[in-house]
């Protein structure tokens, strides 16, 4: 009788709205899932699912280790080879991942190291692909996965909220004081996290959490059930700290990546400085790098903020070693360091002062400011006069002698003659107009668009090249018609172009130009993106291509920076 009922049910007609196993739109999609597009089932362009949308992977740093992770995630034994340069066609939508660094042992691609979702300087012409190994013993038996796990997270969240059947107490207290918060949870959930050392005999757990973060403990414990959590600029610090306390490494990494997208929301710099210190304590290198990059880009604003005097020695040491640090010139950076030393007083030992001073690139200080340094009355100068004089001597040599003369005296691994991103008027031009209007209205008296600027720089910072000029033109295109007018192929908009005229190539044997585009919010004065030019062109990221919450959509300015260096 039971078999008859089941057999009869198979023939019950269904409505036109039924879901079938082969309905691609109705299949549940999971965060971090990957697929291959544009080729065979075992080869194609790699696409990854994030934030409700499929996107591609840039081929920068794309190697066999990354391909192995993708292929194993898809159920193949491994990878045969990688494909780059959009070999399987160009994708659409966001470019989610760039500069991937996989060990090869990760279970899914999103577990690999990367700077952040959507953080890239790529176009879809650089979409990565793979060729997977189908296995020598593969059979023709087809298996179709039935996945009903989509609602599991919500169900477990309801279980936490209801406390039904809870059998374990978490007591939260402020640094040894009496418990101020208790949560009743389920031991079996906590036992899934071996870092907590919960056994069948454990009945409770007491944790010390500062009062400022106690309100976030419940959200953290709920994450242990659901693997879902909302992160904001105000909660990121506490959630990161709590993830460290509870040993949830994956959440720490995820919060660090999310925080990268939220950094621009804090114009005071207090939150990123604090997050860097957390990154130091926990050994989170990705978080440290993301914070340092943002602070380097915004160094001009950071050194004039009250937070500058609170920066730790470790952060200062790391900042001064970076070449992506944006500042008017090297002399301004030295003055900021001297002011920081003055504010710190006796907290910074003479050895540490000397270490920081060694990161100043005296060779690149403008020669007139180099001359003035010898008359400095700063505490740093008084305590390290010999180091200053050595730096001044090397700086004057660099400005007076041809590079061929001093090349053998400079360590190839040294960064002392490599430029940072100097934004002084002699090395950069600023374009503030982002309006698209009448083709006649938006042009100046010379018939040139306000988004096209021509200017001159010296061929090199050395005084030897002071009177040898290179002419540059900076352009910002907001429409396809503008691109077409200047013979530029624009796959997306906006696009920036920056190129030197013919006299640039007169120095090609001794000088190279690694120019940069800086995007700055008009009203907030914070840099949120820095990009290299590839073949004189930079595709300016938008919300969809960055995958980040742009702090000033369609309301930012462009600074084009010339960066000459000896070859």
Curated annotation (Swiss-Prot):
Q: Which residues form the SRCR domain?
A: 34-133
Q: Which residues form the BACK domain?
A: 272-374
Q: SMART domains recorded for this chain? A: BACK, SR
GO terms under biological process: cell adhesion
Do you know which Gene3D superfamilies this protein is assigned to? 1.25.40.420, Potassium Channel Kv1.1, Chain A, SRCR-like domain
CDD domains given for it?
BACK_LGALS3BP
Give the SUPFAM superfamilies listed for this entry. POZ domain, SRCR-like
Disulfide linkage: 58-122, 71-132, 102-112
Glycosylated residues in this chain: 137, 197, 200, 204, 412, 432, 543
- Which key words are in the record? Cell adhesion, Disulfide bond, Extracellular matrix, Glycoprotein, Secreted, Signal
- Note one Pfam family from the annotation: SRCR
A cellular component term (GO) from this record? extracellular region
> Which compartments is it annotated to reside in?
Secreted; Secreted, Extracellular space, Extracellular matrix
Leader sequence segment: 1-16
- Describe the function of this protein: Promotes integrin-mediated cell adhesion.
Which protein, by its recorded name, is this?
Galectin-3-binding protein A
Q: What is the lineage of its organism?
A: Eukaryota, Metazoa, Chordata, Craniata, Vertebrata
